[in-house]
Amino acid sequence: MRFNSEPFDVIVCGAGHAGIEASLAAARVGAFTLLLTGNLDTVGQMSCNPAIGGQAKGQIVREIDALGGEMAINTDVTGIQFRLLNHTKGPAVQSPRAQCDKKAYQFRLKHTLELQPHLQLFQATVTGLIFDGAKVIGCRTNLDIEFYGRTVVVTTGTFLRGLMHIGSNKNEGGRLGDFSARTLSGSLQEAGIELRRFKTGTPPRLLGRSLDFSKMEEQKGDANPTFFAFHDTREDGGVFHVEHGKPQGEAIPPGCEQVSCWMTYTTARTAELVRENLSRSAMYGGEIEGVGPRYCPSIEDKFVRFADKPRHLLFLEPEGRGTDEFYVNGLSTSLPFDVQLELVHSIPGLGEAVLLRPAYAVEYDYAPPTQLKMSLESQRVEGLFLAGQINGTSGYEEAAGQGLIAGVNAARKGRGEQPLVLGRHEAYIGVLIDDLVTKGTEEPYRMFTSRAEHRLLLNHGSAELRLLHHASGCKLLNVNRLDNIARKKEAIESWVRRLESERTSEGTLAEIIRRQNARAELPSELMRQSKPVRDEVLYRVLYSGYWEREQRHIDKLAQIEAVRIPAAIDYLRIPGLRRESALKLAAQRPDTLGQASRISGVNPADVSILMVLIKTGKTPSLPDTATTDGRDVP
């Protein structure tokens, strides 16, 4: 049965963090959008830890907000603890993080989706895609209903042939309590998309009243919280009643009545239990084939890979105001349940803990992201976009950032418009996508500030300034907000010029600020500016030398970054190009010389050969009239 007589502009398959941002972004730029999910009651569920942000991830969330996404606002409104990480270090590596009320976060997102114009929700499990040659035109569902669309965004998370492990026990599913998407993998493979297996895991959940917090160290939120959204949600009554368990009208404004997290450590007994039972672990017992995340290791990995460490830090994180459930951050495991009980009880403060949910590992299919264009469209299937964990990433924030870009580009593809592509110097989202597409990943990819070579320019406070032209060009923000950002940008640049030019007997005001490390007395007019303006002005003045050096480096890189490679180039017929490089370039088909230079195995000499051929117009062409990635031949 066909659901719609006229095709949707965009169909999004999956309503996790990538799917939500994809569907909202597409709808907000005016595309008639359908969001399909197997269960409308789990839209936006925080499957693992109840937190948003953290190192580099906080910057991604602010970039999502700067581009009109929802994650930042949703976090501010449903957050129950806010902290600025690395606050004693420079602004380039400072990152906001928040604990969220898990259910409130989910419910508010669903409510936002329901109210969004141009967006329709429907509960059905996607079982396969519908193709017309090398182009996707819709999808099939378990209800025997077919949905047709101009573009399709697949955001399946851990559900593609998801298999959960607790010791030797196995159950199909992408998350405890939910089924897996079993047949969609076959549909993708039939279209020529390669799939591999990754693994992730989650720790047990505990009953709060069974914990002894007197044996743990308290971790409070910041007295002056750093929020994620640039627009202060408190100004327009940004409250959401569901999470608070109070009568309507008594909801808690963002940042107020914050809750605490708690810290404890593993013991020698914990280590002994892990080592004694390694063979019963699904991971170490050979039950799991997929590669797990390096930067979020299981407790088994911690005691094997870091055997010299006598103990490991654990965080007890509350899952909400209206629940007594706690998440044990750092205790992910695939050990059997009887061992899990002993592990938990070996930890200070958890000796009498009651387990509400077991820890488990989940194995799932992902598509190596080198099969994508920078727009996140498949090279093989026209109109098919992939975002989130299907691209090999881990984390809500990485998924949401990809989802927003995929949603915008799916809408733009349907209109015949150029895609939105963020540069590495413009956004962490740009670094993320460029890394995935040009380098690929052999393990679940997590973003860090160290991955961004231009991180000095990517501080969390500047996101809406550096992405203003993209937000404006894509019509992702309303006119009032765009005007406000433009005025803020002008004010910052004006104040930087003034401080660099106004002189006193001790030098310019900027020189005095740099000499006194921001302790200098600032002009009263500047002090009357908003804190975000003051902070950005001081940051640019204090680090002006580094800032200018970065800009010069970016300008130099732009000389090759902007050079487009002909779509029909035949790398295997280029004289002097090493065969290893030719094969990798032919497989990934980068759009620009800059992308080509970042592909593993391609060296500067290879790039120089390409540069000369492109500039002289002597690049050999493929014999066919179209490239293998579906791009039209110029």
UniProtKB/Swiss-Prot annotation:
SUPFAM superfamilies, A to Z: FAD/NAD(P)-binding domain
Protein name according to UniProt: tRNA uridine 5-carboxymethylaminomethyl modification enzyme MnmG
Record text on subunit structure and interactions: Homodimer. Heterotetramer of two MnmE and two MnmG subunits.
Annotated GO MF terms: flavin adenine dinucleotide binding
A Pfam family reported for this protein in Swiss-Prot or TrEMBL: GIDA
Keyword annotations: Cytoplasm, FAD, Flavoprotein, NAD, tRNA processing
Compartments in which it is found: Cytoplasm
Stated role: NAD-binding protein involved in the addition of a carboxymethylaminomethyl (cmnm) group at the wobble position (U34) of certain tRNAs, forming tRNA-cmnm(5)s(2)U34.
Species this chain originates from: Opitutus terrae (strain DSM 11246 / JCM 15787 / PB90-1)
